[in-house]
Amino acid sequence: MKVKMKTKRGAAKRFKKTANGFKRKQAFKRHILTKKSPKRIRQLRGTKLVHVADVAAVRRMCPYI
């Protein structure tokens, strides 16, 4: 019997698989927002796709999602 790979639980909570790749939330939006401009805070809204260079690492961390 082959041993299953473990999923990195922290990564599984941070990334979701979509048809176009892996979806992630924007960083730098939790605290110390007073010194950031409204434009910058507005642009940090929503989700982005994981960069092509990082997709392989996310796949290794989350083999079953």
From Swiss-Prot:
The keyword Ribosomal protein is assigned to this record: yes
A single cellular component GO annotation: cytosolic large ribosomal subunit
Signal peptide range in chain numbering: none
GO biological process: translation
Keyword Ribonucleoprotein attributed: yes
Keywords: Ribonucleoprotein, Ribosomal protein
Any GO molecular function: structural constituent of ribosome
Pfam families for this protein: Ribosomal_L35p (PF01632)
Domain of life: Bacteria
UniProt family annotation: Belongs to the bacterial ribosomal protein bL35 family.
PANTHER family (alphabetical): 54S RIBOSOMAL PROTEIN BL35M, LARGE RIBOSOMAL SUBUNIT PROTEIN BL35M
Entries under NCBIfam families matching the protein: rpmI_bact (TIGR00001)
The protein, known as: Large ribosomal subunit protein bL35
Gene designation: rpmI
